[in-house]
Amino acid sequence: MTPELNWLSDPTVFAVNRLDAHSDHVCYRTMQEAAQRHSSLRQPLDGMWRFVWSSCPAQRPADFWREGADLSGFGTIRVPGHMETQGYGQLQYTNTLYPWDGRSALRPPQVDLNDDPVGSYAREFDLDAGLRGQRVCISFQGVEQAMYLWCNGKFVGYAEDSFTPSEFDLTPYIKETGNRICVEVYKRSSAAWIEDQDFFRFSGMFRPVYLYAKPAVHLADIWLKAGLSEDNTTGLLTPELKLDGETEGVSVTLRLTDPEGYALYEGPVTGDTIELEGIQPWSHKTPVLYHAELTLKDAQGTVQEVVPYDIGFRRFEMKDGIMCLNGERVVFNGVNRHEWNPEKGRAIDADDMNAAMAVLKANNINAVRTCHYPDQSLWYDLCDKNGIYMIDETNLESHGSWQKLGAIEPSWNVPGSLPEWKDCVVDRARSMLERDKNHAAVLIWSCGNESYAGEDILAMTQFFHAKDPSRLVHYEGVVHNRAFAAITDMESRMYAKPWEIREYLESKPEKPFILCEYMHDMGNSLGGMESYVKLAEEYPQYQGGFIWDYMDQAIWHTDVMGRKVLGYGGDFGERTTDYNFSGNGIVYADGAEKPAMQDVRYWYASPADRAAQDAVNAAAAAQADRTLAEAWQSRRAYPLVVTQGDDNLGVKGKNFEMLFSIAGAGPASLKVNGTEWLWRAPRPAFWRASTDNDRGCGFPLRAAAWMAADVFVTYNGMKVLEAGPDCVKVQFQFGIPTVPGASAELVYTVEAQGALRVDAVYHGVAGAPELPCFGVKFETFGPVTRTVWTGLSGETYPDRYKGGVFGCHEETPHVEPHLVPQDCGMHMQTRQAMLEQQDACGHTTAALTLQQVDAPFAFSALPNTAQEIEAAQHITELPATGRTSVMVLGAVRGVGGIDSWGTDVEEPYHVSGEEDHSVSFRIVL
């Protein structure tokens, strides 16, 4: 057969000579190999390959695959890996728009061959001893996006589908020594129209590549159908096997052992169902796996292969419109997870997966959706072992073919109901199911993501139902085309508002409801999660959701200033792009948890555990209130010394002195034990830096006057209300240049007990825009190196604080490394905060303590002002000023989280400009 370049633009050509998809089992030659998990029947081809990158097919080395071709001009590339992360081609992130939008006028299934980069790979090898004399196949676990394969100068095959294995038989072409494999990988093909996921657009062999041998008889496919009877103690095991090769007279035996190693069954595989008593059901709380070992013998009784596989017995079904696992309603406390590493992109390894699993386990996450493609097989093993429920999603997304600038316009949607696309999308469903069918963790098959709806996706569902009735089928896209409601077994939506979900659940629906995506965690987000979790406690048919998403997608690179920074869309010179819209993780790109994670952990805990934490917090807060009140009441008073100057009113007390400046509109100096704390006089605070969610809903535009007011407030004068040895009280009045205008005042009371009380008041006015916040702000003269506070742990906001644990906490002032800097570091319900300066050895040299007066306050201490943060596009752009910006607030806007492109924060977490706001606190001197 002669390979054709026009296959790239033909959706009916997606697999040429590709072997049938099969289960992800590993064959070992002996029981000893199986015990050691090292197979002599496999030979990895990972490592350095010869490589040439070409900008288009016309520029590629067209004959490099010929036997004896001179490859001396080739460079090298690492496999697994993407071309783009290794310096070949253009890094590009885009969400909905196709990468060629505005550059090539294309319609499905066209490909612009003048803009289709090609990677030419070559690898030379000798066969390992364990593979010689047998049939030899090659497995590409993931190649993006289309590949042609040659072996020793002979064309072998062609394949698409970036995220499931493509395997080929090399037996007619392979030699014991001196082999050369050649692969052409094309970045774009007709598959690009249905692989339009919201991610960086890569190409290359980014998952492992290996050879495997088939003995004379081979276990080509296994399906260990592990069910559970209604009594939840009787397991039902039906092995279905496919043998390949010389099958006459062969035998297969099965040995099944429990977690303690006791044999539950040992005997021949006949195709009959095996009943097993005393089985422990598999679930999130009890992820019990049983070890199956299949032994294949030839007609002479010689062991040909041994296949181990861990299986879980469980029963997943729809009962009265509710999804049930082992007879009990299941609630998905889930997250969407892209495969990601900030150095290697989607070419992740076991360390990445183990780290992600540890995060899921530590934060009460019980489910994961493989958005929007099947993951590496190891991830499924980890989910089996750790009881993580899975929605396994087909590699299908085509939102660029029907979403046009926010409008639904499916005139050239693919796959739709187009017959030429049907086989390729059903093949993608088949490849996923066949590989992953043995995994207990997979409860639901998903037809893909955001691809509208039509006959072709319906055919995928029909395949899933016919092939595997033990699982349900998911697809969200029918919400846009209800004519194909039969595609999905459940009502699935993205970013629906709580009231919209409630409306559905009140309608007595036939199908249960899940959110396949919710809580869009872009930047500083995840506010209002309570509104969703509470639905699960009220409505049995609300069965949870999957946060968007697990990890920020960003890539380490060196910027134009020579600084190493996590780059996002546009940082690499690419257009079109969606900039930082890939930064939606509950962990950063380097795997560190974002501050919002404590609320994920709280809301994904059981109601009983949440109630217990609430009770502990309430008791600890009450004790802190009593302790602080008693400490204040026991403080001794010392006479104040007041000095009236021309511009300044000076006040001295025990261990402190300060100057109130008429011209400076506030305290110009505050010294405690000789240390100056104020860079400039405090001012009313009206602005916190915009978050991604703020920008998405247009809040900065609506509230822009407050940004100006935060910098250009009008000083209307100083009044000395009291000045004596027991008390000095000074008022500063400010006019606010909003439309309509408003006013605020700061009142400072120096108390003889050694404290400066600060009272800030904002006077609301009808028609004033919403505020980002209100309180007091000041910059310290020198840097604060540590803050210690009594209040809730971590970063908290009005709509995201329940996960905080009340106690004494500390941190180094810092700006959170969101892809785009934004407001961060807020601490709600604070009773006391201590700002510390330290020497090089970490010893505290000075400290300033802020305490509540009548009620707790919110505070933040950051190395940059709100304006500096607002102006930066990367954390490396923030200036180092040597100061710390402190805000003490009585009102602060929530961060929101329903989505990041239009929905405002929930109403209770707005700060009205028409209402009065105030905050009071003491600076203990």
What are these regions (language model features)?
Residues 207-223, 313-329, 625-634, 785-790:
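Low-complexity, Pro/Ser/Thr- and charge-rich linker/hinge segments at domain boundaries
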Residues 216-245, 595, 599-617, 629-647, ...:
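Surface beta-strand/loop "capping" patches
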